[in-house]
C-alpha cells in the first residue's frame, strides 16, 4: 500500500527480457535506509518487488500483465521513473490510499505553463470516467494529485513547482503516456452496490444510496 507521495526519482540503468517479462535495474536519486530484500516499491505507480538492493540500486521483475497495462514497457534505458516505498503504519497519510495496481494508461493532451505551475490535460481512459471527479484524488505515474476539472473526454491537474522538481512530471510533454490509478474507495463502493449471488443474480446490497445518505456519505 502507498500514498502517492513520491520520495524521489530513479533512472533505468538496465532493461532486458527475463522469464517472459522484463528485468529492470533502477538507480534511485535518494538513499534507501534499512533496505529489505523483497520489499514492495512503486515504480511509476506500479507495485513491484525490489531485490538485489545495493546502495541506491535495485532490481525489479516486471510481469507481462504490468508491461501490457502500464507505461513501463515503453520506457527506455536512461528513462526517469517515480519511486515510493511501501507505507508503514507509523507514516503520515499525506496523499491518498494507493494500491500500486494501475488501471490504465492515457496520453498527455496538453502541457500549459501557468507561471511556476503547469496545468496538464489528459484523456479520460475508457470506462474510468465515472471514478474521476472534480477535486477528487487520482494517481498519475504514482503521484497523488487532485483533479482540477473533468468532463466526458478530458481531465486536468495543476502541478506545483515542488512536484515538478522532485518527480518525472517536470519532464513530461504532450504526447507522453502516463499510468493512471483511480480512487480505490470509489471502485469498492461501486462493487458493493452491484453485488451478485453465486448464480449471477443481482442481490440487494445493504450498502445502497439510502444507506450512504443516512450515514453522511451522500447529500
Model-based region annotation:
Residues 1-219:
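Conserved loop->alpha-helix
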Amino acid at each position: 500500500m502507498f500514498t502517492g507521495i513520491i520520495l524521489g526519482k530513479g533512472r533505468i540503468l538496465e532493461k532486458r527480457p527475463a522469464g517472459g517479462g522484463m528485468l529492470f535495474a533502477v538507480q534511485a536519486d535518494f538513499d534507501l535506509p534499512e533496505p529489505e530484500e523483497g520489499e514492495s516499491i512503486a515504480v511509476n505507480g506500479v507495485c513491484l518487488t525490489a531485490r538485489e538492493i545495493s546502495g541506491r540500486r535495485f532490481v525489479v521483475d516486471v510481469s507481462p500483465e504490468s508491461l501490457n497495462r502500464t507505461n513501463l514497457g515503453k520506457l527506455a534505458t536512461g528513462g526517469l521513473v517515480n519511486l515510493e516505498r511501501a507505507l508503514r503504519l507509523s507514516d503520515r497519510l499525506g496523499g491518498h490510499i494507493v494500491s500500486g495496481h494501475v488501471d490504465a494508461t492515457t496520453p498527455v493532451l496538453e502541457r500549459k505553463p501557468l507561471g511556476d505551475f503547469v496545468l496538464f490535460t489528459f484523456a479520460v481512459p475508457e470506462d474510468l470516467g465515472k471514478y474521476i471527479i472534480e477535486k477528487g484524488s487520482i494517481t498519475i505515474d504514482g503521484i497523488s494529485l487532485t483533479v482540477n476539472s473533468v468532463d466526458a473526454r478530458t481531465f486536468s491537474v495543476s502541478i506545483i513547482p515542488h512536484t515538478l522538481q522532485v518527480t518525472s512530471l517536470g519532464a513530461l510533454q504532450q504526447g507522453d503516456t502516463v499510468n493512471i490509478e483511480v480512487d480505490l474507495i470509489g471502485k469498492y463502493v461501486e462493487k458493493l452496490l452491484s453485488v451478485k449471488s453465486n448464480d449471477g443474480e443481482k442481490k440487494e446490497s445493504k450498502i445502497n444510496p439510502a444507506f450512504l445518505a443516512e450515514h453522511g456519505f451522500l447529500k
